[in-house]
Amino acid sequence: MRKIGTLGLVTGLTMGAVLGAMSLPTLAASERSAVLEEVVVTARKQEESAQDIPIAITALTQELENSSIRNLGDLNGYSPNLIFGSDGSRGGGGANINIRGISPTRSDDNSFDAPVAVVIDGIYLGTLAGQVLENFDLERVEILRGPQGTLFGKNTVGGVINVVRSRPTGEFGGKFKLTGGQDGQREARLVVNTAISDNVALKFFGTKIDYDGFMDNVTTGRGVAEKDYGNVGATILVDNDRFDALLTIEGFSDAGTLDAFHTNYNVGKDVLPKPPQGSAENDFSEGFTTCLAFGACRTSLATPGFSENDKDNVYDLETEAVTLNMTYELNENLTLASVTGVRKVNEYRLYDFDASAAPFITIERFNDYEQTSQELRLDGAFENLKFTAGLYYFNNEFEQDWITGDTFWGVLFGGLLRAPDIGAVLGVDALAGVPGLVACQIGVFAPVACDSALTMNDISGNITQILYETQDTTSVAAFFQGDYNLTDDLTLTAGLRWTREEKDFIAGQAYLSNEQRALARNFPGYADLSQEWTELSPKIGLTYQVNDNAIAFISYSEGFHSGGFFGVNQNIRDFERDQYDPEYAGNWEIGYKSQLLDNRMRLNVTYFRNDFEDKQESFVALDPDTKTVASVFDNAASVIYQGIELEVQYVFNEYLRGFLNYGRLDAEYDEFETDINPNDAATIIEDASFLNPRNAPDFTLGLGGTLSLPMGDGTLETFVKYTRIAEVDANLLNLKQSKIAERDDLAASIGYYAENWSLVAYGKNLTDERFEVFFPIATLFAAGSVNRPRTLGVELSYQF
C-alpha cells in the first residue's frame, strides 16, 4: 500500500504543479528565454557538462542561493536516495551522510572512516568533524551517487559530495548576508573581491553564526544545539596564460552544545512492553539501571519538549586549513595539475551519555587530528581520447584521550575498591587482608585495571575510567581513467586505481583513576597493531549518444571502504579482536540522460545494483568479565543494494520551474550472522539475514519549484520544496524503539530580489513534524535525540 500511496502522491503533486503553471501568462521565447542552463562539473577531474558524463550525478548551482539551504545538511530532497544528516554526537559540523543506503556504521570516532567522501576544492576531508559546510560562497555542489573509487579513491563506496567554492574575480566587489531567526539565530556572511595586479586576484571571506538552541535544558538552563561559529579566510589567484595557482588559507571555530543525547529515554518498569515469548527482541520491560538506581525514570513515550541532562553536552572545534590548486598547460592537449592540502583539527566533546538528570555517566573526549594530501594529475584531451592519470598521497594522524566519569564506575566497582579485605569479600583465602584497590592494581580484576599511583583517599569521590588511542594512516595510489570514442556515437570508458594503505594503531588498556589524573596516561599496557592492504578499483563502461540531447550508458565499478582498528574499546583483547578488513562494493549502473522540449525539460533515469561484500558491522554487547558493555566490530555481512532513481527538471514558462527527485531502494542482507540479542549475557551467533539493513529507506522523494514574478524593478520569488523519506531502521538489530517513521519535511521561502539586494523570509520543517531516536546501551541506560522543530528566519543580502 505504501508504494501505491507514494506513486499517487508524486503523480498528484506533479499534475498540480503543471495545472498551476498553465494559468500563468507566457511570454514569447524571443522576449524572454525559458530553458535549463548547462551545468559544468568536475566530477571526473576535468570540466564537463553534467548531462554528458555517464555517472549518476546531481549538480547544484543556482539552488544554493536559496535561503532555506543554510548548510549541506539541508540538501535532502535535491537528489534521489540522499539523506544528508548532521551527526549531533560530533558537533562542529559533524556529518552522517547516507547515499543509496550506505552510511557510516560508526561516526563518533576518528578510528573509523566514512563510506561517503566529502571533498572541498579537491581535498578529501578525512574526519567527519567539519563536513557539514556552511552554504556561502559555494559555486557548486556535486552529489555523485555510487562507488567513485577509480578517480576519488578509498572510502567512496557510497558516493562523493564534491564541493567547489568560488574563485576570486579580479574585480573589486563583494556580497554580504545578514540573517535573523527564532531561538536567537543571528548570522553574518561576507565575501570581498579585489585585484592586486592584472593577473593576481584576492578574495576575503568570513561567516559568523550564533544560535541559542531549539530546546531548553531545564537542569542547567542552557539550550540544546547552541552554536557559536566563525570562519575567516583568504584566497589568492595567480592566473597567467598557461599557469594558474589558487591558494586558500582559512580557519574555523565552532563551539556550543551537541544536538544529541538530549532527551532522557531511561524508562522505568513496564513502560516498554515485554517482547513475545521466544522472541529475539531486546527486553527493556524491566527498565534501565540508571533510572532505577537514581529514581530518574521517564514514565511516558510521548516526545518530550525539554532536556534534563545534569551536564550540558558541549563541544569545541578549532580547524586550520591550507589548500593549493595549480594547473600548467603543457600544450593544447595536455595539462598538469597539482592539488595540495593540509588540515589540522582540534576537537573537544563532553556528553552526558545517560541523558538524564542523574549524574550517572559522562564521556569526555580530547582529539587532535592532522592530515596532509597531495595529488598530481596529467589530464589529456585528443580527438578520440580523453583521459586523467595521476598519483595520490594521503596521511592522517590523530590522538585521542577520552574519559568516562561520574558515578558509573563507582556504582559498579566502588565497593570492591574500597574494601579493606578483598579476600573476605570474594571468599578467596589467597587474597586475605589485601585491600580492594591493591587487588585491582595487581591485576586481580583483569581486564579491569587501576592506576598504580592511586591511593585510598583518591577514590573517595567519583571514579574515572581513562582511555587513549592514536593512529597513523598512510595511503598511496596511482590511477588512470579514459574515454575512447569507438565510433561517433559509442564511447568506451575504462579506468583502474591501485591503492596501498597502511594503518598503525596504538591504544592503552583502560584503567580506573580519578578526575585529577585524567590525562596522566599511566596505562598498564598497550595494544600496538598494524595492518596493510593493497587494493584495485576498476571501472569499465559504454556510453551511447542517442541523439544530440540524450545519452544512454552502462557501467561497472568497484570500490573499497578502509579496514582498520575500532578505537571505541576498553581492553587490549578487544582492540586485537576488533581488527577489521576493508568492505568491497561492486556496482552496476544503467542510465539514461536527456534534454527535452528545446532544453525546457531534463529527464535522467538510473538503475543501480551495488553488491557489498565483507560489510563492516558494529553492535554493543555485555562484557561478561567487566559486567559493562563492549563494542563488537567485524566484517559480518553481505548486502545487496539496488534501486531506481528519477530526476526531472522542467521549465513550465518564464515564471515557473520545478523539479522532481525520486529514489527507490531495495536493500537486503545476502548473508549476516550475529548475536541477535546481545543483552542476555549469552553470545549466540545465528542467522540474522532476515533483518533490514539499517539506514536504508525504501524511498526518498523531493518535489518542488520556484515561481518568479516581475514586481517593480525586481522580482518576487517563491520557492517550495517537499521532502519525504520512508521509514528507517536506525538500529542494526531493528529495535522497534529505534525505528524512524516515514517523515515529511516542507521548506519554503518568499523574497524580493532587486538588482543588487534581496530580502527573503524562509522556513524549514514548516509542518513541525517531530520524531525521537532511541539509543540504548544494553539495559544500563538509554538516551534519545529529537529532531529540530519548525524554523523561521529572514535574510537580507546585498552585492556591491
Which residues fall in each region the model found?
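Acidic, small-polar-rich N-terminal luminal/periplasmic segments of exported/outer-membrane proteins
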Residues: A34-E171, I590
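Outer-membrane beta-barrel translocator/receptor signature
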Residues: A114-P115, T127, F136-E139, R145, ...
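Solvent-exposed loop segments that connect transmembrane elements
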Residues: M215-G223, D259-E308, D352-T362, I403-I466, ...
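Outer-membrane beta-barrel domain signature, strongest for Gram-negative TonB-dependent receptors
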Residues: G221, K227-T388, F394-E399, R602-N604
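Structural signature of Gram-negative outer-membrane beta-barrels, strongest in the C-terminal barrel
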Residues: L237-D239, L378, G390-F394, E469-N610, ...
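Membrane-embedded beta-barrel scaffold of Gram-negative outer-membrane proteins
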Residues: N325-E329, T335-G341, N346-Y351, Q545, ...
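Gram-negative outer-membrane beta-barrel transporters
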Residues: K386, D488, L492, R609-D611, ...
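C-terminal beta-signal and adjacent terminal beta-strands/loops
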Residues: T407, V411, Y655-G658, T723-L732, ...
